[in-house]
Swiss-Prot record:
Biological process, per Gene Ontology: defense response; vasoconstriction
Family assignment from sequence similarity: Belongs to the bradykinin-related peptide family.
Location of the protein in the cell: Secreted
Cysteine disulfide links: none
The organism's place on the tree of life at top rank: Eukaryota
Name of the protein described by the UniProt record: Bradykinin-related peptide Pnor-5
Amino acid sequence: RPLSWLPK
């Protein structure tokens, strides 16, 4: 998932 590094 490309957005796996985005903050949550």
